[in-house]
Amino acid sequence: MISIDFEYCSEPKDWGLDAPYKDKPYAVKLFCVSICNEIGTRSWWLQDADQRADFIKWFDMNETYLAHAYEIAEAKCLAQLGIDPGLVNFYDTWTISMLLNDTREEASLVNMCKKFLGVNIDADIKELMRDHCIKDETQGHEEEIMRYCESDTVYLKPLLEKLAAVYNYRLSLSNCIALGTSLDYTFTDFIESTSNDIRASMIISKQGIPVNAEYMKRLQSAMTQFKMDYIQEMNSRFNCFKLKKDGTYSEDQAVIQELLKKEVPSNWVKTASGKLSTASETLKELFDCHRPDKRFGEWLFYWKEKVQPASKGIADGSWLTSLRGDRMYVSTLQPLKSKTHRWQGRSKEGYVPLWTGWTRAAIDPPEGWYAIECDYHSEETAIYGVIFNDPKYLEQYRSGDAYCYNAINMGLLPKECVSKKKCVTLEQQNMRSTIKTFTLAWQYGCGVKKLSVMSKLDMDKTKDYKKRLEDVYSESMKSKRIIGEQLGDNGTLVFPDGYPICYSNQYGHTTKLNAPIQGFGAYILRVVVQRALKAGFKIFATVHDALWILTQDINDGQRLKQLMEDTARELLHDDTLEVGEPFILAHGDHKCEDSEDTKIWKKYIGD
């Protein structure tokens, strides 16, 4: 439930919600403040009191306060649910209506739940509000709050949680709001990117462009493209949409009914009420894995075809895990190749008895066992240097601080600033921070416009920095351009073990600028897993460029490290790529209170 933190808003006069919200109902104000406090207590960029005040002040001046607050809160909710925060659900006509405070019958969240879940949540809404009406600050406003709650304006998180399981319209966040196209999102990255987008919106606002209109225009455009892609995909399979005279499409119910009479396709799902979903709800199979993981598609294909049979009895054959947000993902997937060259499948949030933190798995293995992680150190940088034969990337790999190295070679920092500690002035520290953001966005294929937004630089300076960075890594840029010319905007690269990586600039997954690197990293990890399983290691998680094993021998960490280094050396024909020291957790190092722990661990070690 979205909590209301009254510490910062004990009196209405302190809320800072003057025009245009001074005449708005109490419940709307309450919702705005609760959202602001919620994200304020969780987001690093709002920890500072002055930043917090500026944030509230800016939103007070814009009609889009509710929409933006909702957008951020929703993404947080999705992350907490284990749903990729790089996707934004529910951006369909109903949700747009809700964002605009529309309480028409068809816009009702209650009716949506009845339609898609087969459940009545009226009582849930009322119970939610009763919990909060006990607060002194809400006394005298109970009826008003109840009325607004029932019209879907406040406390949406528990309802979104219920809806998220079956209502799967998903849009790439990079298509909805101007973020980087294929950053390797963790939840922290998402919060940082979202804050940059808000700052960009502030700039738009100052230039006199209505933020709300601009936002809705981009959103509507992305929605239209998304739905057309979906209709084309479904028609290629089932021919279940028909073109109407006005140029729009509608479901062909006759075709759908015929399909339902036959054996139900395995990719069709049942709703909570037990009814079979129709074509418009099979997005679970089509778009559930539409997320910018560094090398998700080609790896899960390998997992399904090769690792699953080999690891039977070790990892239950379906436990592909990757860090995303504040928990681990567990995916069971049926990969397919669509017309847009995207690898996709079906994923679901599953229980893994190891996650409690933000950026690292916190595991409490059974007594007498160790959970050990080994990962490659700066894998992408090393692969850039070796595969593209770029001496600058190899120098960067050994420099100890990639961002200082880049800034020095770009002529933006003096040669003595070889590390963060050596950047002694505020100006030097700020420059390193800027180049860090700039380098990451550039390396993942962002264009000039996105680079400008991400690094908060004007266009002229952005173009200058981009040119300087490309000059530093001129050798790898040549190779990138050759690949781009040969394969165009969408294509497939096949690696030595026969598995492909597919990329699409249209959707901003793995782009042609980084596909060779991500794909080769996946290739290395595939071979490592194959050899580790053959050597008897019990692998229970893979996280991008890392493995987690469960063992009773603490020395297995060093053995796994050696196996990973030997494999990289053999496949790259180079000894550059290193493996960090094993991260070891014993029983009791982290407390895991979930009662399912013992049951789940048996999947890995037996009775």
Regions found by a protein language model. Give the residues of each.
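Extended, well-ordered alpha-helical scaffold/bundle regions in very large, multi-domain proteins
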Residues: 189-295, 444-483
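Acidic, glycine-rich two-metal-ion catalytic cores of nucleic acid-processing enzymes
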Residues: 4-40, 190, 243-424, 483-546, ...
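Catalytic palm active-site di-aspartate
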Residues: 92, 152-156, 199-208, 212-213, ...
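Catalytic phosphate/metal-binding cores of nucleic-acid and nucleotide-processing enzymes, i.e., regions
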Residues: 4, 9, 27, 163-169, ...
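Mixed-charge, glycine-rich, non-catalytic linkers/tails in nucleic-acid processing enzymes
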Residues: 129-248, 388-397
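Polymerase palm active-site segment centered on the conserved acidic dipeptide of motif C
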Residues: 220-249, 467-481, 554-607
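Active-site-proximal helix-loop-helix substrate-binding element of RNase H-like nuclease domains
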Residues: 28-58, 63-180, 406-421
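Short, amphipathic alpha-helical "recognition" segments used to contact nucleic acids or chromatin
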Residues: 433-444
